[in-house]
Every structure is written in C-alpha cells, then in structure tokens.
C-alpha cells in the first residue's frame, strides 16, 4: 500500500495549541505528516523561518510520524508534489475559514488535480485561537499559556519583552 503523506502548510507565527491539535489528529489519520512553515507575503512575521521550525520541532518531538520543514518560496501544490504529499491538511475554526479554505482547495486543484484537501474542524476549546490574536495579546503583556504550547509561550515572552521595556 502506498504511504499516505499529508502536508500541513501554514505561517505558524506563532504555532498555537489549535495547530498542535490539528497536527496530532492528522498524525492519526496519515502515515506521515509534514508541517511546512511558509512565508506569507501578506503578513509581517514575528519569528523568522528557522525559529518557527525549531519551536515546532520542540513541540512535536513526541510525534514520530510528524516532521517540520521550511517551505521554499513556491506554490504549496508544487511543494506537496516535491515531498510526495497527496493530501493537504487544513484546520477550520468557523464559516469564514471554510469559505477561504474551499477557495484555496479549488485553486490547488488547478495546479494538481490529484491533491486532496482534508479539513479538520477545530475542537471547541481551540476554535477561537488565531496566531494574530495571540501575538496581540502577547505584545501587550497578556497571558498566552492557554493558547500556545509552553515552548512557544516562552519564545513569545522573550521576543516581545524588549518592546515593553
């Protein structure tokens, strides 16, 4: 049987507990899951690519069938082909996410008709978490421990403490 490889692309700036839950669930559905840390030209990143990769590696260390890579500046569909992934994993928090992901899935199909997008609904306890809101809360000194894994919380605190001095 062919190995079922899934790609979970995102900017992950920062990687949240919602992202982690999606990865954990995907790891039970697929033989291998590759987290692709992407550069989103529309966003101003807080963490650089290597830092995000290192943080995510720390967080997923106990997931044997999950790896993380920095995605080169290329289309996600092309990168999926390059790593042998036939599935894209996307987490859905609400109707707005669904609309957006449906359109992206259709566009990805124009690039690779064999690439399937698998949507995982966010669990209730993670449905309100967004990376941009986490960054804003952290930037103003708020508590993010319930929103991000411990290693990410520490990194956020370290990164943003200079702005509050």
Swiss-Prot record:
The keyword Nucleotide-binding applies. It comes from the Bacteria. Keywords: ATP-binding, Coenzyme A biosynthesis, Cytoplasm, Magnesium, Nucleotide-binding, Nucleotidyltransferase, Transferase. One of its GO terms (cellular component) is cytoplasm. Its EC number is 2.7.7.3. The record marks 19 as: Transition state stabilizer. It is found in: Cytoplasm. Its cofactor is Mg(2+). Disulfide bonds: none annotated. Pfam families: CTP_transf_like (PF01467). It catalyses: (R)-4'-phosphopantetheine + ATP + H(+) = 3'-dephospho-CoA + diphosphate. It is an enzyme of class 2 (transferase). SUPFAM superfamilies: Nucleotidylyl transferase (SSF52374). ATP binds at residues 11-12, 19, 91-93, 101, 126-132. One of its GO terms (molecular function) is pantetheine-phosphate adenylyltransferase activity. NCBIfam families: coaD_prev_kdtB, cyt_tran_rel. This is Phosphopantetheine adenylyltransferase. The lineage of its organism: Bacteria, Bacillati, Bacillota, Bacilli, Lactobacillales. The gene is coaD.
């Amino acid at each position: 049987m062919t190995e079922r490889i899934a790609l979970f692309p995102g900017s992950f700036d920062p990687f949240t507990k919602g992202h982690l839950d999606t990865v954990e669930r995907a790891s039970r559905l697929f033989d291998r899951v590759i987290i692709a840390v992407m550069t989103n030209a529309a966003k101003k990143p807080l963490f650089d690519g290597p830092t995000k990769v290192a943080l995510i590696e720390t967080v997923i260390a106990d997931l044997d069938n999950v790896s993380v890579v920095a995605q080169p500046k290329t289309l996600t569909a092309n990168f999926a082909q390059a790593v042998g992934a036939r599935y894209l994993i996307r987490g859905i928090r609400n109707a707005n996410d669904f609309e957006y992901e449906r359109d992206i899935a259709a566009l990805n199909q124009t690039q690779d008709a064999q690439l399937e997008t698998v949507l995982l609904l966010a669990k209730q306890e993670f449905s309100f978490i967004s990376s941009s809101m986490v960054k804003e809360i952290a930037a103003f000194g708020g508590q993010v421990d319930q929103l991000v894994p411990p290693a990410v919380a520490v990194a956020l605190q370290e990164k943003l403490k200079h702005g509050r001095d």
